[in-house]
């Protein structure tokens, strides 16, 4: 029993360190890494680990995802709640490791588009890399006894396919190439191939002959520079490899390197990199052992010898780049635009981070600068290409989006200049400077550089990185730390090295004198070594308010005896503590109440962050992802400081008149406006804003250029301006908003929103929402959707009626809802003629299977009686039924003539067998079944999805007699999709198949609407596919997950083998080879990878 208690406590400790849970297969490993032992579930009497976990629900919460993956989460415990809180809030030197946190905004992961950005060019075809660097596919070593490299049948020859080559905007002729399915990319090129002259020139550069032992033929491998887009990633990999080699001074086998790399950085090392080490003398030294084996030894680079040879020669400064020649303008080319005009266009576009339609540029330009827009500018968009990026939609010059050009980083400018002058010169110069620094360091281990420059902190590129909030003085300067392998994990590694260096180096002594700005290594509590910076000093101590731990963002009093000079080698990592600005709170950034609320909600806690603007102090939105739903911290803080005196405080048993019902939801929930001080002040402000906009010319500064969830702005509806809060951003054009003062939710265009004028902003955002959420008392709650007829009758009876009355029976503070009796003007204050009683006494409800409303029970009390209700006059039920019938006849119109169920779009275009096709994989079950979309058509689907959201959000809900195997529009997760109805369930749900994304979903039948003809033009984008080149009768769950991880939600190149046509576009099928060409130096053929995996799996089994 004691052992069981110990195991459960240790298990809880393991799970609590993983905020987003631990997958069941990883749980044993995580447990052992903490305790040194496995979970002894068999000794505890359970046949499996899962059975044991399910037996301790007080410790573990188990969830199963759609894919069947089981994840374990820690359950809350009163014993450890206080400890968890203290750990989260601590600001001591204790480190928080990156792998303890993995915050991701779930709401952001469900976006059906914008996963990879809008495709602006074709994907690199296998065999030809970006910038024409030749790809090198690793030669696998499995199954050589079967005559090929990857277990694919030797006679599986592919028909000739077309290879498209492109340089700049010039497209060369198609080059036919015959290849074997397992051929390495090195073997795809031959000097005899009929390539265009520019391409032949490129291939004829210095080539190194290389024998392919796989196909026994000579290939040519040009030595070319990797593209600029790959430089950053390669530099990161090289630095990591140097770190590994520095820890293994006696050498390391090259075959063992991937294992060490993955163990240290939790990331796979690309196999193609292993073949490039001999070309990286500045990173490592490669040695082939005398034993003659295939494995190689790697050593740290021999830099000192190279240094001497460099320093012996005279240092010649590089000559300046030649000035570009002034060429006369070519005949027929349009004249260049004036410089000041281009500057103004660039300044204007900078305000539109999501781009601006070219057709909207003249008006925005004239609104902003009050000068006439040049007439010929739109006809000559190419002349603006030096100040903006032009994205032509579908190649149509009349439809283009203009984006502001971001300034190039310094290293990119240097790289471009170096390439113009010569790659060799710039490489020599950088190597010389780097080696000079190393030589200076090597001369004396005690030499410290006082003015060492620490590189700036790079903002993470991932969609929603995790941050730890440290402290804040105002919401425009919130101190945070990024959590992740390149941030907190790298910092951990550095601090371990600092501890080893300062603890074991007797020559290192404490500083004798200190000065402002000096960087120090501080021996903090618990024997941790941290970096700190001095701003001011006082006698023998360093003033607390001016000594900051640069990686943690807080200050501390320390003795000089604990301060040491910081070795320059610990200055390569950026300071980890940085600042951010909370979006939407700028106008109240210094408000003491707001600062107090933000501090109480955020300090010491980890959040997912959405970065809106990348700047020195980035603009962000924080999300708490610890609960079932993601909580917008910015919006929560803004609501918390609303003026409570302007709220409508409802009192139990009180009667309120002149109440206006503003919204009725499909579950019977109502939103009401009750006369109060806040409503009067809001109406006055909105009238002033109306007058302000009427008198002032509407310029571009009032257009919303940066929408984000939680932002409060204005929307013009029914002749007046209303407050709305953005609740969901679908795309750069469409988003969902909620009217704060009516409770209505709808989808609108971004261009229809306006910023609140600055003079009214502070006043209007502190007024609480004036829509009060209510429900009808004595009616069953939590029954789901009401019947359409009842909702229609209720809306027709009370919606937007300004003189209704209510009596409050209960206020549920936790749910934020009031239980009321609702009266129309004619029936007030008769309790037996309330809306509540009329609904519960109607026979119409009894004919609905999905609604369970019955006559009011004898125990239910009326507003004026405690012993039950008096019978309603006999004709009231008949009158109600008659009013329902009239409302339905008036509200429901037969739209069947507007929608033809027979009209279907043409089938989506697929490449012919043997040709390439750029595809995107939205869904992957296993190699035998996955779904592809044409990559080049995704932007068209994106536009269609936006239009559907806007169309159906304002369309009247129609009652559809659905039929199986027919095409409809259905709302799935706040978005409208084109679907095929697969089945009708008895519980009010229907099974649908998304025709553009290939997913099967269950939706409420009320969310199914006719598909308008305007949305039947674009071909259905989802095509069922099967992977060629590999066969397996039954794919295991493990193999399926491996396949999904490599292809799902990724753009790939497909080589079409077979197209199986069908009369129904959703029944078409294609058999393809898939190639991942995202890396410039490697083609990953998915069927080869899966073949290797099956072989390895068979060996294990």
From Swiss-Prot:
Q: Which residues form the HTH OST-type domain?
A: 3-76, 233-302, 337-406
Please list the residue ranges that the record marks as compositionally biased, kind Polar residues.
127-138
Q: What are the GO BP annotations of this UniProt entry?
A: lens fiber cell differentiation; lens morphogenesis in camera-type eye; P granule organization; piRNA processing; post-transcriptional regulation of gene expression; spermatogenesis
GO CC terms, sorted: P granule; ribonucleoprotein granule
User: InterPro entries under this entry?
Assistant: LOTUS-like (IPR041966), OST-HTH/LOTUS_dom (IPR025605), SNase_OB-fold_sf (IPR035437), TDRD7_LOTUS_3 (IPR037978), Tudor (IPR002999), Tudor_domain_containing (IPR050621), Tudor_TDRD7_rpt2 (IPR047448), Tudor_TDRD7_rpt3 (IPR047449)
Residue ranges crossing the lipid bilayer per the database entry: none
Q: According to the UniProt record, where is the region Disordered?
A: 126-147, 859-880
The organism's superkingdom is given as Eukaryota
Query: What's the chief localization of this chain?
Result: cytoplasm
Q: Where is this region: Interaction with CDK17?
A: 864-1101
**Region Interaction with CABLES1: start-end pairs:** 896-1101
Which positions bear Phosphoserine?
319, 862
Annotated Pfam families: OST-HTH (PF12872), TUDOR (PF00567)
Keyword annotations from UniProtKB, A to Z: Cytoplasm, Differentiation, Phosphoprotein, Repeat, RNA-binding, Spermatogenesis
Where would I find the Tudor domain in this sequence?
513-573, 706-763
GO molecular-function terms, A-Z: mRNA binding
Instruction: State where the protein is found.
Output: Cytoplasm
Report the family membership. Belongs to the TDRD7 family.
Task: Please name the PANTHER family in this protein's record.
Answer: TUDOR DOMAIN CONTAINING PROTEIN, TUDOR DOMAIN-CONTAINING PROTEIN 7
Q: How does it assemble?
A: Found in a mRNP complex, at least composed of TDRD1, TDRD6, TDRD7 and DDX4. Found in a complex containing CABLES1, CDK16 and CDK17. Interacts with CABLES1, CDK17 and PIWIL1.
What biological function has been recorded for the protein in this entry?
Component of specific cytoplasmic RNA granules involved in post-transcriptional regulation of specific genes: probably acts by binding to specific mRNAs and regulating their translation. Required for lens transparency during lens development, by regulating translation of genes such as CRYBB3 and HSPB1 in the developing lens. Also required during spermatogenesis.
Put simply, this protein is called Tudor domain-containing protein 7
Protein source organism: Ailuropoda melanoleuca
Q: Which gene encodes it?
A: TDRD7
């Amino acid at each position: 029993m004691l052992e069981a208690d110990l195991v459960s406590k240790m298990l809880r400790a393991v799970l609590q360190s993983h905020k987003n849970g631990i997958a069941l297969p990883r749980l044993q490993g995580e447990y052992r890494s903490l305790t040194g032992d496995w979970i002894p579930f068999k000794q505890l009497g359970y046949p499996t680990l899962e059975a044991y976990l399910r037996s301790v629900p007080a410790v573990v919460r188990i969830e199963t995802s759609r894919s069947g993956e089981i994840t374990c989460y820690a359950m809350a415990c009163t014993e450890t709640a206080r400890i968890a809180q203290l750990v989260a809030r601590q600001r001591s030197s204790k480190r928080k490791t990156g792998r303890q946190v993995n915050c991701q905004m779930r709401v952001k992961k469900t976006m059906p588009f914008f996963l990879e950005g809008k495709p602006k060019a074709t994907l690199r075809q296998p065999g030809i890399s970006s910038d024409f660097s030749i790809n090198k596919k690793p030669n696998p070593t499995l199954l050589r006894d079967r005559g090929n490299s990857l277990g694919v049948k030797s006679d599986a020859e592919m028909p000739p396919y077309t290879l498209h080559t492109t340089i700049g905007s010039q497209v060369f002729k198609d080059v036919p190439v015959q290849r074997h399915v397992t051929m390495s990319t090195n073997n795809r090129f031959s000097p005899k191939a009929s390539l265009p002259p520019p391409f032949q020139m490129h291939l004829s550069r210095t080539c190194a002959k290389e024998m392919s032992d796989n196909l026994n033929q000579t290939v040519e491998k040009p030595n070319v520079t990797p593209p600029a887009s790959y430089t950053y990633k390669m530099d990161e990999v090289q630095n990591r490899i140097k770190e590994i080699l520095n820890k293994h001074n006696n050498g390391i086998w090259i075959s063992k390197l991937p294992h060490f790399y993955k163990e240290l950085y939790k990331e796979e090392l690309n196999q193609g990199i292993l073949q490039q080490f001999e070309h990286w003398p500045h990173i490592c030294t490669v040695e082939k052992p005398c034993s003659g084996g295939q494995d190689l030894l790697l050593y740290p680079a021999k830099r000192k010898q190279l240094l001497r040879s460099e320093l012996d020669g005279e240092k010649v400064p590089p000559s300046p780049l030649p000035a570009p020649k002034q060429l006369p303008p070519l005949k027929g080319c349009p004249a260049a635009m004036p410089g000041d005009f281009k500057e103004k266009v660039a300044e204007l576009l900078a305000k539109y981070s999501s781009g601006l339609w070219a057709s909207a540029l003249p008006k925005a330009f004239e609104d902003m600068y009050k000068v006439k827009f040049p007439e010929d500018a739109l006809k000559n968009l190419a002349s603006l290409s030096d100040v903006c990026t032009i994205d032509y939609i579908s190649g149509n010059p009349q439809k283009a989006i203009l984006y502001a050009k971001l300034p190039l980083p310094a290293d990119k400018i240097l790289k471009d200049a170096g390439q113009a002058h010569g790659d060799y010169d710039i490489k020599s110069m950088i190597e010389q400077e780097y080696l000079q620094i190393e030589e200076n360091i090597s001369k004396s281990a005690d030499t410290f550089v006082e003015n060492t420059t620490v590189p700036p902190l790079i903002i993470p590129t991932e969609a929603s990185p995790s941050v730890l909030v440290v402290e804040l003085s105002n919401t425009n300067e919130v101190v945070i730390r990024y959590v992740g392998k390149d941030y907190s994990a790298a910092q951990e590694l550095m601090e371990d090295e600092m501890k080893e260096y300062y603890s074991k180096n007797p020559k290192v002594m404490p500083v004798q004198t200190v000065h402002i700005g000096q960087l120090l290594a501080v021996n903090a509590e618990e024997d941790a070594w941290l970096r700190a910076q001095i701003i001011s000093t006082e006698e023998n101590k360093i003033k607390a308010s001016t000594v900051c731990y640069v990686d943690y963002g807080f200050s501390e009093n320390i003795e000089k005896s604990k301060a040491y000079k910081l070795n320059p080698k610990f200055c390569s990592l950026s300071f980890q503590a940085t600042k951010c600005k909370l979006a939407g709170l700028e106008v109240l950034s210094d408000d003491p109440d707001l600062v107090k609320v933000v501090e109480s909600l955020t300090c010491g806690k980890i959040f997912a962050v959405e970065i809106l603007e990348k700047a020195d102090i980035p603009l962000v939105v924080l999300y708490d992802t610890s609960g079932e739903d993601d909580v917008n911290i910015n919006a929560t803080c803004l609501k918390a400081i609303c003026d409570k005196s302007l709220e409508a405080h409802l009192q139990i048993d009180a009667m309120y008149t002149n109440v206006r019902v503003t919204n009725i939801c499909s579950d019977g929930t109502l939103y009401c406006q009750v006369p109060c001080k806040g409503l009067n002040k809001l109406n006055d402000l909105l009238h002033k804003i109306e007058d302000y906009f009427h008198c002032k010319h509407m310029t571009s500064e009032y257009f919303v250029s940066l929408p984000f969830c939680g932002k409060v702005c204005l929307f013009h509806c029914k002749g007046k301006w209303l407050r709305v809060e953005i609740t969901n951003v679908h795309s750069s054009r469409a988003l969902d908003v909620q009217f704060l003062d009516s409770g209505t939710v709808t989808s609108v265009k971004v261009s229809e929103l306006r910023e609140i004028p600055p003079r009214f902003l502070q006043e209007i955002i502190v007024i609480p929402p004036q829509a009060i959420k209510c429900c009808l008392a004595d009616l069953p709650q939590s029954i789901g959707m009401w019947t359409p007829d009842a909702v229609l009758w209720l809306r027709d009876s009370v919606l937007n009626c300004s003189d209704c009355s209510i009596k409050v029976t209960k206020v549920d503070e936790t749910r934020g809802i009031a239980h009321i009796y609702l009266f129309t003007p004619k029936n007030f204050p008769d309790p037996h003629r309330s809306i509540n009683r009329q609904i519960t006494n109607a026979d119409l409800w009894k004919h609905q299977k999905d609604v369970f409303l019955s006559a009011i029970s004898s125990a239910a009390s009326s507003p004026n009686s405690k012993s039950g209700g008096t019978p309603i006059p006999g004709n009231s039920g008949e009158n109600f039924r008659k009013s329902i019938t009239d409302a339905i006849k008036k509200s429901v119109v037969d739209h069947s003539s507007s929608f033809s169920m027979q009209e279907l779009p043409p089938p989506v275009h697929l490449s012919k067998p043997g040709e390439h096709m750029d595809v995107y994989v939205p869904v992957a079950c296993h190699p035998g079944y996955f779904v592809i979309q044409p990559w080049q058509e995704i932007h068209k689907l994106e536009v269609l999805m936006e239009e559907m959201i806007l169309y159906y959000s304002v369309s009247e809900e129609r009652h559809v007699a659905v039929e199986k195997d027919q095409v409809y529009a259905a709302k799935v997760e706040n978005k409208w999709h084109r679907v095929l109805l697969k089945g009708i369930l008895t519980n009010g749900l229907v099974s649908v198949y998304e025709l553009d994304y290939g997913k099967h979903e269950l939706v409420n039948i009320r969310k199914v609407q006719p598909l308008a003809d305007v949305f039947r033009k674009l071909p259905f984008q989802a095509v069922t596919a099967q992977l060629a080149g590999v066969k397996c009768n039954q794919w295991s769950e493990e193999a399926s997950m491996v396949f999904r991880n490599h292809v799902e939600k990724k753009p790939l190149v497909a080589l079409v083998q077979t197209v199986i046509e069908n009369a129904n576009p959703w029944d078409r099928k294609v058999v393809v080879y898939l190639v991942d060409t995202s890396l410039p130096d490697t083609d990953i053929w998915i069927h080869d990878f899966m073949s290797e995996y099956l072989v390895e799996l068979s060996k294990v089994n």
